Curated annotation (Swiss-Prot):
HAMAP family: Malonate_MdcG. Its EC number is 2.7.7.66. The active site is at residues 134, 136. Changing residue 134 to A: Abolishes transfer of prosthetic group to acyl carrier protein. Keywords: Nucleotidyltransferase, Transferase. One of its GO terms (molecular function) is nucleotidyltransferase activity. This is Phosphoribosyl-dephospho-CoA transferase. Transfers 2'-(5-triphosphoribosyl)-3'-dephosphocoenzyme-A to the apo-[acyl-carrier-protein] of the malonate decarboxylase to yield holo-[acyl-carrier-protein].
Amino acid sequence: MSATPRPHDLVWLNHASALEDIAEPWVAQQWRAALPVVVRRDVDDQARVPVGVRGMKREQRAAGWVQARNIVRSVTPEMLVDREVLLHSPFVSQPPVQGAIALTLHRWPWGWGVTGSTGYALATEIPVLHAASDLDLLIRAPQPLDREALLEWQTRVAQLPCRADTQVETPYGAFALNEWLRDGRALLKTSRGARLTATPWHREE
């Protein structure tokens, strides 16, 4: 893979042994290379890519690492909100997918996508969705975004047929949109931990 994987990307590996430093025993029993892992936020002195593995149970999540050369396929959150992908999904009747379809009807001034269990289901067609599933949304924001446009997004998200939360990804980390709009500051999740900030588009001094 030539592109650098980013947090929330789903990546497929060339072999099961490509998954490194996994301690949880259930991973060997449940995970196989045909299933993607999700890129997470972390740093490594060996320049490996931080990933997470999801198991069959909600609480089964394991953190590990992979060498970039062992990644053979990548699906970004943005790729999963192509309207044709959504309309032809076997989960099109589920509320989170209906919510994503509703958001595609408006032209937004930023790139956005779907993560979490909805993203995993759309990418794999594995039935991890149900009627009460949340819709996890991601906005890519390399530059500061217009507050009024974000308020419009939040208004539309509040009207979706499911619970939905939006993370905004800046060059320095990600924060919860509702928290930032409500309080004027938010907890920015970075590769080296979280920090409370009112300026998520600025590097911490």
